Structures are given as C-alpha cells and as structure tokens.
From Swiss-Prot:
Pathway membership, UniProt: Pyrimidine metabolism; UMP biosynthesis via de novo pathway; orotate from (S)-dihydroorotate (quinone route): step 1/1
Function summary: Catalyzes the conversion of dihydroorotate to orotate with quinone as electron acceptor.
Highest taxon, organism lineage: Bacteria
Name of the protein in its database record: Dihydroorotate dehydrogenase (quinone)
Length: 340
C-alpha cells in the first residue's frame, strides 16, 4: 500500500542512483533484527515447494540476476519472500561497466533500458558476500566474461568463475545473452556454443567429484533469436545435457516502445515491453526441448496473469526484477500466494 508513495520518491532519482540506494537499504535490512521486522511487515507466505534441476525450491518465484550484482543485499531481498535469488552477473575481475548514464526508464510502458556492461566487483567479492548471508532459500550465481577478455578466450572466464562459484551456489547460470558486452551473444551460436558447453560440462564433472556434490548449470538466452537459432540452441543444450535454460534476457528490439521517451537509448530493454516476446520464446523452446530440460521464465512479469502465461508456455520457475521496481514487494507476495 505504501509502495506507490515510495515509488514516487524513487522515480524522482536517476535510475542507477535509485538502484544503489535500494541496495544499500536492503543491505542494512540484512541485520537479523531488521530482517525479521521486514519479513513480518511484508508478510509473504512460504509458498508452494517445487523441485526443479534436482533442487527443492521453497516456492517458484525468484529474483532475476542484475538486481544484486555483488550479493550485497541477499538477506534483504530474501525477506520479501523469494523462493530463490540469483546474484550477479559477476566476472573474474572487477570492472566498471559502460559509461554513465546507462539506465533509463520508459515509464509509460513500465520498461527499463540498461547498458550496464556487467559492472561488478569481481567473483571473489561476491563469494565473500554469499558466505556472509543467512538466506534460507535457493541461491544462484550468474557468471559472465570480462569486457577485456577476447571473445575467443571467453570460455576461460566462464571456467574461472565456475571454479570459484561451484561450492557456494545451489545452481550456476552461464550468461551469454547480455547485449551490453561486445560480441557476447555470438557465444549462443554454432560451434562457439558447442565448445563452451562442452568445456563447462567437463569442468562440472570434475568439480562434482572434487566437492562430492552436483551443482546444476543453466544457460541464459536472449529473446532476439530466429526460429533456426532457437532450434540449434535447444539441440545443443540437450546434447550437452544442460540442467536448465533461463528464457530470457533483455531485448534489443524496440517494437513495443517506439516513439516513447528514452526508447532510442542503446541497451537491453526489460519490463512489460518484453512480456510477450519472452513468453513466446519459452513456448517455442519448450516445444523443442520436449520437457527434457526445465525452463526458468523471465521477462516482463508484473502480475498473476502473465506469470501464469509463462507457466502455461512451459516455464517451471519464474524470475522477476523490473516488475519489482514498478510494483514493489507486494508483487512477490501475490505471485508466491498464487503460482504453484
């Protein structure tokens, strides 16, 4: 009920400034006493348990990567009632990302454009924060490559992060679909994807033996794929027996926001304008995967109806982020109460 007033204050600030303040506030809310108080205030129920990728999720509603890049606010976000939280995207080395301003709201469409460029403090810093958290849900770590790493050696960055994250994550996501790191999306296609997934699965096997536990690995894909590209990706992830696919990342398309303020800004578009595009990718991907590999649906979820559309299209779990900015923690509660 209070959120419309809070949102007014948030939206008076630059998007990145508002985001940084929110992360600081949620970091403070990680204090055990404050955390209990926030949980009581928000009153989110436990939700319905669901087992996906061999993991028991306390409910199927998760926080998408990008919200908490460095794992600074895991417990604060946890108090909202999320069944799982995905931190990152994180890279081997700290990097500043692209020049500011790099986040833009499209308020009339409830959309956000970002061209952040994987700004983060590096994998070691993230792992330190993960170690300090007390969150009782499922934790995913989303990994990427540094901008300075040539795309031909991108695989090395993913393996480096995989080695570091393996013992601290319930699952790991390989992000090859951000539009804001030059050439990154080329890793989604043909031999490049085949080679990357082969190396990742080989390393996963070694790490599973080393730590005596199996940590599932999901692939995060873009919404801007042709039918042929999607068929090829589906074939490759099945062949390499990936544990999950997250569909989707942000879009470079502007079809749904043409003529609106900030719509011409370069970057990935998320939020409501991505809603139908991501659901359609889920539907097509589900058809290709034939239920063999679970899909985590993400992109424009802002209410029960479109959340259920993604489940009906084939998603087993859901992730939100932009919807949280526009609708506040009440959205988490509504989805947790409703989505089974």
């Amino acid at each position: 009920m209070l959120y419309p007033l809070i949102r007014k204050g948030i939206f008076a600030l630059e998007p990145e400034t508002a985001h940084n303040l929110a992360i600081k506030a949620l970091h403070i809310a990680g204090n055990p006493w404050l955390n209990r108080a926030l949980k009581a205030l928000l009153g989110c129920p436990q939700g319905t348990e669901k087992t996906v990728m061999g993991i028991k999720f306390k409910n199927p509603i998760g926080l998408a990567a990008g919200a908490d890049k460095n794992g600074e606010a895991i417990d604060g976000f946890g108090a909202m009632g999320f069944g799982f939280i995905e931190v990152g995207t994180v890279t081997p080395l700290a990097q500043d990302g692209n020049a500011k301003p790099r986040q833009f709201r499209i308020v009339e469409a409830e959309g956000i454009i970002n061209r952040n460029g994987f700004n983060n403090y590096g994998i070691d810093h993230l792992i330190e924060n993960v170690n300090k958290s007390h969150y009782d849900g499922t934790l995913g770590i989303n990994i990427g490559k540094n901008k300075i790493t040539p795309i031909e050696q991108g695989k090395d960055d993913y393996i480096f992060c995989l080695n570091k994250a393996y013992n601290y994550a319930h699952y790991i996501t390989v992000n090859i679909s951000s539009p804001n790191t030059p050439d990154l999306r080329t890793l989604q296609y043909g031999d490049a994807l085949d080679d990357l997934l082969k190396s990742i699965k080989e390393r996963q096997k070694i790490l599973a033996e080393q730590y005596n536990k199996y940590v599932p690995i999901a692939l995060k894909i873009a919404p801007d794929l042709t039918e042929a590209e999607l068929v090829q990706i589906a074939d490759t992830v099945r062949r390499h027996q990936m544990d999950g696919v997250i569909a989707t990342n942000t879009t470079i398309s502007r079809d749904t926001v043409q003529g609106m303020k900030n719509a011409a800004e370069i970057g990935g578009l998320s939020g409501k304008p991505l809603q139908h595009k991501s659901t359609e990718i889920i539907r097509r991907l589900h058809r290709e995967l034939k239920g063999d590999i679970p899909i985590i649906g993400s992109g424009g979820i802002d209410g029960v109806q479109n959340a259920q559309e993604k489940i009906a299209a084939g998603a087993e779990l859901l992730q939100i982020y932009s919807g949280l900015i526009y609708h506040g923690p009440a959205l988490v509660k509504t989805l947790v109460q409703t989505i089974k």
